[in-house]
Amino acid sequence: MTERKGMEEINREEFQEVVVNIGRVTKVVKGGRRFRFNALVVVGNKNGLVGFGLGKAKEVPDAIKKAVDDAFKNLIHVTIKGTTIAHDIEHKYNASRILLKPASEGTGVIAGGSTRPIVELAGIKDILTKSLGSNNPYNVVRATFDALAKIKA
């Protein structure tokens, strides 16, 4: 299936998706407990386009599907210089801080938790990252995306 993003066509088949987090919330009712799920998903084509989305539903697969649809609505283009990023950048979102540093070729992706799938799906091959402060998956993903969007060639 193809979608339009700005002036370019987006082919969903060339994108990969990674589920970063699945959360469960419980509502206690007279008959017992009712569960609902939320899913945080990152999609990317390993060529500079990457997006994230949050989906909520009564079943996990439905939440993931909604999150993927949301991720395609939030695609950003990441500026990649060779196999890494152009310069150091630090960004804060709520209580999460993320530090991204360019790395020399052959270093690989040194990232943890929620940051790793984002930089891998963006197509960055060599990068050093450090997550500081809160490790809430949504906040870390949002801080990483905001930082990658601010990188200038």
Curated annotation (Swiss-Prot):
Q: Which UniProt keywords are present, listed alphabetically?
A: Ribonucleoprotein, Ribosomal protein, RNA-binding, rRNA-binding
A cellular-component GO term for this protein:
small ribosomal subunit
- Pfam families to which the protein is assigned, alphabetical: Ribosomal_S5 (PF00333), Ribosomal_S5_C (PF03719)
Q: Which residues form the signal peptide?
A: none
In terms of superkingdom, the source organism counts as Bacteria
Q: Which GO terms describe its biological process?
A: translation
Picking any one GO molecular function of the record gives: structural constituent of ribosome
Cite the Gene3D superfamilies for this sequence. 3.30.160.20, 3.30.230.10
**What InterPro entries does UniProt report for this protein, alphabetically?**
Ribosomal_Su5_D2-typ_SF (IPR020568), Ribosomal_uS5 (IPR000851), Ribosomal_uS5_bac-type (IPR005712), Ribosomal_uS5_C (IPR005324), Ribosomal_uS5_N (IPR013810), Ribosomal_uS5_N_CS (IPR018192), Ribsml_uS5_D2-typ_fold_subgr (IPR014721)
S5 DRBM domain location is: 15-78
Q: What exactly does this protein do?
A: With S4 and S12 plays an important role in translational accuracy. Located at the back of the 30S subunit body where it stabilizes the conformation of the head with respect to the body.
The similarity annotation says: Belongs to the universal ribosomal protein uS5 family.
What is this protein's record name?
Small ribosomal subunit protein uS5
Gene coding for it? rpsE
